[in-house]
Swiss-Prot record:
Record pathway: Bacterial outer membrane biogenesis; enterobacterial common antigen biosynthesis
Function, as annotated: Catalyzes the synthesis of Und-PP-GlcNAc-ManNAcA (Lipid II), the second lipid-linked intermediate involved in enterobacterial common antigen (ECA) synthesis.
The species this protein was found in: Proteus mirabilis (strain HI4320)
Protein name in UniProt: UDP-N-acetyl-D-mannosaminuronic acid transferase
Enzyme class: transferase
């Protein structure tokens, strides 16, 4: 699939790839059995707003190869600014699972980073049992800065073509940037708390809520402490209605 055939939409200065759906995204990342190299970063309204005042995060987003619309507010923003856009929300957790399933079919070597030791072990076991994923190495999130360079070398030596990092943002993006200097020939994806969801330690919103674009509300009801974060998003709503996206 030609790179030029995938439209990009600018939202607050960030170029977001306009994939129509999950299958469209996966077919782009995989050319036959070969997977592209680069970095995947999920974009939502909160990340866009944070990048406005966090120069480091803004630079990380600029350096990423593939920014994709993870938040429903970003999708709606794209559709408002570009009325003919055919773009769908692609939740990071769903993309990761789809990517792992495809990796299992293609035999793509995968390296997992992050999470608690127990959760990581359960993630490995489930991936192997469910999709026969070729996991060539793993490292839980409890490593020191002094261990990082050795970990990069382990990832390189493993021959991994997909590296997923569950450390939260922006730690996982910083990890990706540094690891790519050592092992550029892989697709990197920051996945936040996806391992916890995959193994059942954290409950995700029911499908009906997801389909209605209300996963954010489900999380808010489950974690009322998130209310301050949600209020900050009113700034994005202002951009939306004032056509300043």
């Amino acid at each position: 699939m030609d790179t030029n055939s995938i439209p990009k939409y600018s939202i607050r200065g960030h170029n977001i790839w306009g994939f129509k759906d999950m299958a469209h995204f996966l077919d782009y990342l995989y050319q036959g059995a070969q997977i592209k190299s680069g970095s995947l970063i999920a974009i939502n309204a909160e990340k866009i707003l944070t990048a406005e005042t966090d120069k480091g995060l803004n630079q990380l987003l600029d350096e990423a190869d593939y920014l994709y619309a993870d938040g429903i507010s970003v999708v709606r923003g794209i559709r408002r600014k570009y009325p003919d856009a055919q773009v769908s929300r692609i939740a990071g957790a769903d993309l990761w699972e789809a990517l792992m399933e495809r990796a299992g079919k293609e035999g793509t070597p995968v390296f997992l980073v992050g999470g608690k030791p127990q959760v990581l072990a359960q993630t490995e076991s489930k991936l192997k049992a469910q999709w026969n994923v070729n996991i060539v190495g793993s490292q839980d999130g409890y490593f020191t800065p002094q261990d990082r360079d050795a970990l990069f070398e382990r990832i390189k030596a493993s021959g991994a073509k997909i590296v997923t990092i569950a450390m939260g943002s922006p730690k996982q993006e910083l990890f990706i940037r540094a690891c790519r200097q050592v092992h550029p020939d892989a697709l990197y994806m920051g996945v936040g708390g996806t391992y916890d969801v995959f193994t059942g330690h954290v409950k995700r919103a029911p499908k009906a809520w997801q389909n209605l674009g209300l996963e954010w509300l489900y999380r808010l009801l489950s974690q009322p402490s998130r209310i301050k974060r949600q209020f900050k998003l009113l700034k994005f709503v202002g951009y939306y209605y004032s056509n300043k996206l």
